[in-house]
Amino acid sequence: MPLTQDRKQELIGTYQVHETDTGSPEVQVAMLSDRINQLTEHLRSHPKDFSSRRGLLKLIGRRKQLLAYLAANEADRYRALVDRLGLRR
């Protein structure tokens, strides 16, 4: 199930870097993490849903790329984001 508009606005408001920010790496990673958590819960109850599993792996790869970009260019923002999201990195 995709993110609702209200949930997206909530995530943007929480993780935005400046007032009009909607596409910074922090916001993108937060949205991907929320979607990843939803898909993980879905797959716990539907373990044979392989198309959703493939989508989950694609989302994880995209989040990994964005986190690598942040780690390489803005290490302090990267560490703050990982702490706020509770990721194991």
From Swiss-Prot:
It comes from the Bacteria. PROSITE patterns: RIBOSOMAL_S15 (PS00362). The keyword Nucleotide-binding does not apply. InterPro entries: Ribosomal_uS15 (IPR000589), Ribosomal_uS15_bac-type (IPR005290), uS15_NS1_RNA-bd_sf (IPR009068). Coiled coil: none annotated. Keywords: Ribonucleoprotein, Ribosomal protein, RNA-binding, rRNA-binding. GO terms for molecular function: rRNA binding; structural constituent of ribosome. Disulfide bonds: none annotated. SMART domains: Ribosomal_S15. GO terms for biological process: translation. Pfam families: Ribosomal_S15. The keyword 4Fe-4S does not apply. Belongs to the universal ribosomal protein uS15 family. Part of the 30S ribosomal subunit. Forms a bridge to the 50S subunit in the 70S ribosome, contacting the 23S rRNA. One of the primary rRNA binding proteins, it binds directly to 16S rRNA where it helps nucleate assembly of the platform of the 30S subunit by binding and bridging several RNA helices of the 16S rRNA. Forms an intersubunit bridge (bridge B4) with the 23S rRNA of the 50S subunit in the ribosome. This is Small ribosomal subunit protein uS15. It comes from Gloeobacter violaceus (strain ATCC 29082 / PCC 7421).
